[in-house]
């Protein structure tokens, strides 16, 4: 198999670290591996597959000779993606910078792989919560068109980075020792006011917009329509940060154009790649973030009719937002391109 020169921008962060784990786990065919980060992280050494790599500071010349550039996310995407594309690399980007650009495909490989072919050098990775939800929606949409979605998310602190994890740990310790819980990170470090996440829920992820939705909520709404190619789908979302380390959970209410049978819905989900049913109420079996972390797949449970509205169903979906919600989805896009010969110049 041909091997490719790969660059990882943001190699020292949570998603960048996950890229490395997955490249090894999935035997991704790389020849050269170039680890890039900010000036602050440059010079750091990373042991990977028996070799020591030195992290380089990202510059406009960092992508010469690179075939695939995996961007872990953040504001640097806007700065460096054009340089990477100019050198001939395909950029697969985890930031929100390009997601709603009509010239940039927004891809979940199991859902809309054909959109990859529309790329002009950049392919966008969706928001983590969007990915987890559309993985559950797509097999059901193939049974009957979806008219309306009401989703509430329960998002882990690792979605806010290592700082979110550290703050939950420290606050839990402080609370157990009778000390005041200090808050500096959530709902967002850039905001003027912060709240403890330990023993708490924060119904704000990202900033509020003029319509009183948060930016995170509007990402889910707009990105889902783009991925599913259905601008008429009505969607409303409430996104909540919860005191869980890893894996996002979502309660999803779905109204269809016509009625479906529960057994057909469960069969469709189980037959769809990357997602599986975990649903046995009699034996208290349902997906939980503690037990689905580090997994490749997303998991669906609590599938049932909404008795208040016809043709409407409820489900609960859980997925690892660092894996399928970020690094795994990105790598899968590259794998689809390699498998189909779409990287050949």
Regions flagged by a language model, labelled:
Residues 69, 157-345:
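Charged docking surfaces used in two-component/phosphorelay signaling
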Residues 1-192, 232-234, 284-286, 298-299, ...:
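N-terminal Rossmann-like NAD(P) cofactor-binding subdomain of oxidoreductases
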């Amino acid at each position: 198999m041909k091997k490719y020169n790969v660059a990882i921008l943001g190699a020292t962060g949570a998603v960048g670290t996950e890229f490395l784990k997955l490249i090894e786990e999935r035997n991704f065919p790389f020849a050269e591996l170039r680890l890039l980060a900010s000036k602050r992280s440059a010079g750091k050494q990373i042991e990977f597959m028996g070799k020591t790599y030195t992290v380089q500071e990202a510059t406009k010349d960092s992508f010469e000779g690179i075939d695939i550039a995996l961007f872990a996310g953040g504001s640097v995407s806007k700065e460096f993606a054009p340089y990477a594309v100019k050198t001939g690399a395909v950029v697969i980007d985890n930031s929100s910078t390009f997601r709603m650009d009509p010239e940039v495909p927004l891809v979940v490989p199991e859902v809309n792989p054909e959109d990859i072919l529309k790329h002009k050098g950049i392919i966008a990775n969706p928001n983590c919560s969007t990915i987890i939800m559309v993985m559950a929606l797509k097999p059901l949409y193939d049974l009957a068109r979806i008219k309306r979605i009401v989703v509430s998310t329960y998002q882990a602190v690792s979605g806010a980075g290592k700082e979110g994890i550290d703050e939950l740990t420290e606050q839990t310790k402080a609370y157990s020792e009778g000390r005041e819980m200090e808050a500096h990170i959530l709902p967002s470090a850039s905001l003027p006011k912060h709240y403890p996440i330990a023993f708490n829920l924060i119904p704000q992820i990202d900033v509020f917009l003029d319509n009183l939705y948060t930016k995170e909520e509007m990402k889910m709404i707009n990105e889902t329509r783009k991925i599913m190619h259905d601008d008429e789908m009505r969607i409303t979302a409430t996104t909540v940060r919860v005191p869980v380390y890893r894996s996002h959970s979502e309660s999803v209410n779905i109204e269809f154009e016509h009625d479906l049978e529960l057994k057909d819905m469960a069969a469709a989900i189980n037959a769809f790649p990357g997602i599986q049913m975990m649903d046995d109420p009699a034996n208290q079996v349902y997906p939980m973030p503690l037990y689905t972390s580090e997994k490749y797949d997303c998991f669906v449970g609590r599938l049932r009719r909404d008795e208040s509205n016809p043709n409407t169903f409820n489900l609960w979906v859980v997925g690892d937002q660092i894996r399928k919600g970020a690094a795994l989805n990105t790598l899968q896009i590259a794998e689809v391109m390699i498998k189909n010969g779409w990287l050949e110049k």
